Amino acid sequence: MRIILLGAPGAGKGTQAQFMMDKYGIPQISTGDMLRAAAKAGTELGLKAKELMDAGQLVSDELIIDLVKERISAEDCAKGFLLDGFPRTIPQADAMKTAGVAVDFVLEFDVPDEEIVKRMAGRRVHAGSGRTYHIVYNPPKVADKDDVTGDDLSIRPDDEESTVRKRLDIYHTQTEPLVAYYKNEAGQGNGEYHKFDGTKTVDVISAELATVLG
């Protein structure tokens, strides 16, 4: 069961990835984690990647594809894997296909931009403990104060509205074209493409996923 997850930041991919990992016993592969692990393991590819990252340079698509191939040949990927955050662009998707990395399911989580802004801009965090709140979905007992300590809550820079909108713009420009790409692939019999309404409750989406994936 080889799965690619698509969806804007804040669309709920992480929550559903956890559900699929637990249910199907497959690992989630995020390129960031993979690059760090390969660099730490000191493999030839990992050392190449580390050299580039240490110099503040982008790791090439070719090198990432090689790392993906190396990672998915590991024992824990025998039943399959979840790719999150890769591919991000059409050239990366093409390179993956050329490298012979087949995919069974592409799952898109669709949430309108304004809902994502509301989700992320409403998050509040207690710096000392990492406790998180949401002004709409999980508000603190006293506005902007931590329930336990009474300390002020803060907004993470990543959750600032301007940052969220920038990330959404990048997603729409770079990654959204993959939706059409993978729909086309599915039309040619290369895997299945499924779109989920990310505004539904977590349990409903999980149940829909289980129906699709079996």
From Swiss-Prot:
PROSITE patterns reported in the protein's UniProt record: ADENYLATE_KINASE
Residues annotated for ATP binding in this entry: 10-15, 123, 132-133, 200
Designated gene of the protein: adk
Assembly with partners or alone: Monomer.
Main EC class the enzyme belongs to: transferase
Main localization, broad class: cytoplasm
Catalytic activity: AMP + ATP = 2 ADP
EC number of the protein: 2.7.4.3
One of the record's GO cellular component terms: cytoplasm
Pathway: Purine metabolism; AMP biosynthesis via salvage pathway; AMP from ADP: step 1/1
Transmembrane listed as a keyword: no
Residues annotated as binding AMP: 31, 36, 57-59, 85-88, 92, 156, 167
GO aspect biological process, one term: AMP salvage
Native source species: Psychromonas ingrahamii (strain DSM 17664 / CCUG 51855 / 37)
Name of the molecule in the record: Adenylate kinase
